[in-house]
């Protein structure tokens, strides 16, 4: 089984992944994009943490390189091992669209399909959404921002809107959860969905 957690930075994906892992401590493989492979860790550093400045187009292709490597080394084995992944191609498309480069969504979908071995994976998607005010509060309390988060609140809210649209366009039946609520209530909904 393959489970993707989606949502912008600060919605609680990591918290919910840890809660799910603690309940089902069978051998789930927990992974993430970017950074779920050795190459991915290096790309994550360039994309999110380094002072290295790259163009938005180069950024898009580095995320795609990470996704292709992650698919080949990790995700394509989800028929043999249960995998929980923090982010998916949905994030890749949503963030790329928010960069205001006039990219075509169908081109982005096709590029991501190439990175994913030619098709969208059969998976369960959990989409955590948050209000602008709660996101502001959470990000302010966290304090430490990566290069993407530094683009600001409006940018992240635009990404969240893009994610909703991508799920509709691709007809992905994601479990959409209001991340403004109680952590334990959110966890209950996720647990029920994953069963």
From Swiss-Prot:
It comes from the Bacteria. GO terms for molecular function: ATP binding; dTMP kinase activity. One of its GO terms (biological process) is dTDP biosynthetic process. It is an enzyme of class 2 (transferase). Signal peptide: none annotated. PROSITE patterns: THYMIDYLATE_KINASE. SUPFAM superfamilies: P-loop containing nucleoside triphosphate hydrolases. Coiled coil: none annotated. GO terms for cellular component: cytosol. It catalyses: dTMP + ATP = dTDP + ADP. It holds the Pfam family Thymidylate_kin. Its EC number is 2.7.4.9. Keywords: ATP-binding, Kinase, Nucleotide biosynthesis, Nucleotide-binding, Transferase. ATP binds at residues 7-14. Phosphorylation of dTMP to form dTDP in both de novo and salvage pathways of dTTP synthesis. Belongs to the thymidylate kinase family. This is Thymidylate kinase. It comes from Campylobacter hominis (strain ATCC BAA-381 / DSM 21671 / CCUG 45161 / LMG 19568 / NCTC 13146 / CH001A). The gene is tmk.
């Amino acid at each position: 089984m393959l489970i993707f957690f989606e949502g912008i930075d600060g919605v609680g994906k990591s918290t919910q992944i840890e809660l799910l892992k603690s309940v089902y401590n069978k051998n789930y493989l927990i992974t993430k994009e970017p950074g779920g492979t050795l190459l991915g860790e290096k790309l994550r550093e360039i994309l999110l943490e380094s002072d290295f400045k790259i163009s938005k187009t180069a950024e898009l292709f580095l995320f795609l390189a990470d996704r292709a490597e992650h698919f080949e080394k990790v995700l394509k084995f989800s028929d043999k091992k249960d995998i929980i992944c923090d982010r998916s191609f949905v994030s890749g498309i949503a963030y790329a669209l928010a960069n205001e480069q006039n990219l075509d969504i169908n081109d982005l979908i096709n590029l991501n399909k190439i990175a994913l071995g030619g098709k969208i994976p059969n998976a369960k998607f959990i989409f955590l959404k948050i209000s602008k005010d709660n996101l502001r509060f959470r990000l302010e309390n966290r304090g430490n921002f990566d290069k993407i988060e530094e683009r600001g609140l409006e940018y992240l809210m635009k990404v969240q809107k893009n994610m909703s649209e991508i799920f509709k366009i691709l007809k992905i039946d994601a479990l959409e959860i209001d991340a403004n609520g109680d952590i334990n209530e959110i966890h209950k909904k996720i647990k029920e969905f994953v069963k």
